[in-house]
Curated annotation (Swiss-Prot):
It catalyses: D-glycero-beta-D-manno-heptose 7-phosphate + ATP = D-glycero-beta-D-manno-heptose 1,7-bisphosphate + ADP + H(+); D-glycero-beta-D-manno-heptose 1-phosphate + ATP + H(+) = ADP-D-glycero-beta-D-manno-heptose + diphosphate. It is an enzyme of class 2 (transferase). Catalyzes the ADP transfer from ATP to D-glycero-beta-D-manno-heptose 1-phosphate, yielding ADP-D-glycero-beta-D-manno-heptose. Residues 1-334 are annotated as: Ribokinase. This is Bifunctional protein HldE. It comes from Bradyrhizobium diazoefficiens (strain JCM 10833 / BCRC 13528 / IAM 13628 / NBRC 14792 / USDA 110). ATP binds at N209, R210, K211, E212. The keyword Cytoplasm does not apply. Pathway: Nucleotide-sugar biosynthesis; ADP-L-glycero-beta-D-manno-heptose biosynthesis; ADP-L-glycero-beta-D-manno-heptose from D-glycero-beta-D-manno-heptose 7-phosphate: step 1/4; Nucleotide-sugar biosynthesis; ADP-L-glycero-beta-D-manno-heptose biosynthesis; ADP-L-glycero-beta-D-manno-heptose from D-glycero-beta-D-manno-heptose 7-phosphate: step 3/4.
Length: 494
């Protein structure tokens, strides 16, 4: 059975009004990129010639960044040390308009910092150096974390616990958070690190990777069915509604407490870096569920987001636009990309076509209710050139030409219908009563109109012919008229 097309734009619109409370272990991720061409004379180890470096908000902070990049607001609660790395993280979070950070400072511990040395040519991690103290937060710091977390729960639509086992998510912090969230009816997602899943009791969803799941369940977890078989006991132990096990190139398996398990294969992509891919999955699930998506939709969004994340270098974030391109069918996107809104984009496309030696044609109209007469003209117009640009009257232009009760469909809807036609290569909306400015800009090799016009009546014929182009008149189909169709639809006689 084919997968139905997801109304991604509606989902994204809902996500934009949601807030995720993210709690967990933040860290400073540094990437040093360079080339390796020799072995050190001092020891049998490769020498990396550093060429550039990048700094990112990592760990649970990367989850927060992905929540924000996917369109939701994020409240982030984490722990830093009284050091330079902590100050850099605080400053970086302050630069994120969609993230509100509440950082608890513990002077007795360093801010977690990870430096990765990467061979740029081979996209290979050569070495990682860590600065961290993984012991659980002290009783005093625990109390400060709980005090910071509890007031934020009511402000959020969903709570996300990102556990990197660096001391923030102690059993006490987790218990206070989940109990408070459940009391307020807020779903809780946990990306777990502890093997004792009893501490996550009451969470809505657990999102372990395959290794974490296998260790926690003491199972092989090497097939979707083995994951399903091993899930029953731990779901009862954790009192959760579902478990999602991520399996890298083998996809994801969702096991809900009620209903059938679902396995989705990974989206085929060239994997460049898996750093932070789990963060992206957790964030995508959180924003989807916060927006009211069902399990299948949330799983689909998370799987697509993961495929975008692993195709990037470094601790990656995924934007709404990238996710949209990954989820929606190519044909849908191809049609959408035919609609040009900026003159610069039109000029660039025309220049590219002409560099390729392609003849550009042009026709125009209101195209309010597309009918066979329109299709015949558009098909014939495409036959007179290599690439067809359609000028579309804006809503204001149509009202001036056709009356206050037109258009029936707005300009965006009319543009989308035209763009879906194979004969049409580009749609450009114009505000004027005639397309003369657009024709002057394009200077098409062929200017096409229906045969109910004479050559002299075709707007822009002088411009086109002066530039060496031709005017093409196409025989029209009798009996088809948008005005007549509208009249009939409103109860008029045939």
């Amino acid at each position: 059975m084919p997968t139905p097309i997801l109304d991604f734009d509606a989902l994204a619109q809902t996500i934009s009004g949601r807030t995720v409370l993210c709690i967990g272990d933040i860290m400073l991720d540094e990437f040093v990129y360079g080339e390796v061409s020799r072995i050190s004379p001092e020891a049998p180890t490769p020498v990396i010639v550093a060429q550039r470096s990048e700094i990112h908000i990592g760990g649970a902070g990367n989850v927060a960044r992905n929540v924000a990049s996917l369109g939701a607001r994020c409240i982030f609660v984490g722990l830093v040390g009284e050091d330079d790395a902590g100050k850099r993280l605080a400053a970086a979070l302050a630069d994120q308009a969609a993230i509100e950070s509440v950082l608890v400072c513990d002077p007795s511990r360093p801010t977690t910092r990870k430096v990765r040395f990467v061979s740029e040519h081979f996209s290979t991690h050569m070495l990682r150096a860590d600065w961290e103290q993984a012991q659980p937060a002290s009783d005093e710091v625990e109390a400060k974390l709980i005090e910071a977390i509890l007031p934020q729960i009511a402000r959020a639509d969903i709570v996300l616990l990102s556990d990197y086992a660096k001391g923030v998510l102690t059993a006490r912090v987790i218990r206070h958070t989940i109990d408070a969230a459940r009391k307020l009816g807020k779903p809780v997602i946990v990306d777990p690190k502890s093997l004792n899943w009893a501490i996550y009791r009451g969470a809505t969803l657990l999102t372990p990777n395959r290794k974490e799941f296998a260790e926690a369940t003491r199972s092989r977890a090497d097939t979707p069915q083995s994951i399903v078989d091993a899930s029953e006991d731990v779901m009862r132990l954790a009192d959760c509604e579902a478990i999602l096990v991520t399996q890298g190139e083998h996809g994801m398996t969702l096991v809900p407490r009620n209903g059938a398990a679902v396995h989705v294969p990974a989206v085929p992509v060239k994997v460049r870096d898996v750093s932070g891919a789990g963060d992206t999955v957790a964030a995508a699930l959180a924003v989807s569920l916060a927006a009211g998506a069902d399990w299948d939709t949330a799983l689909r969004v998370a799987n697509a987001a993961a495929s975008v994340a692993v195709s990037k270098l470094g601790t990656a974030i995924v934007s709404t636009a990238e996710l949209r391109r990954k989820i929606l069918p190519h044909a849908y996107l191809a049609a959408e990309e035919k609609i040009v809104l900026e003159p610069a984009a039109l000029d660039a496309q025309l220049a590219e076509w002409r560099t390729q030696g392609l003849r550009v044609g042009f026709t125009n109209g209101c195209f309010d209710i597309l009918h066979p007469g329109h299709v015949k003209v558009l098909t014939a117009a495409r036959g007179a050139c290599d690439r067809l640009v359609v000028g579309l009257n804006s809503d204001a232009s149509v009202r001036r030409l056709k009356g206050a009760d037109r258009p029936v469909q707005d300009e965006r809807a009319r543009a989308e219908v035209l763009a879906a036609l194979e004969a049409v290569d580009l749609v450009v909306i114009f505000e004027e009563d005639t397309p003369i400015d657009l024709i002057t800009r394009i200077k098409p090799a062929a200017l096409v109109k229906g045969g109910d016009y004479t050559r002299e009546q075709v707007v822009g014929h002088e411009v086109v012919e002066a530039a060496g182009g031709v005017v093409v008149l196409v025989d029209i189909l009798q009996g088809f008229s948008t005005t007549a169709l509208v009249h009939r639809a409103r109860g008029g006689a045939k």
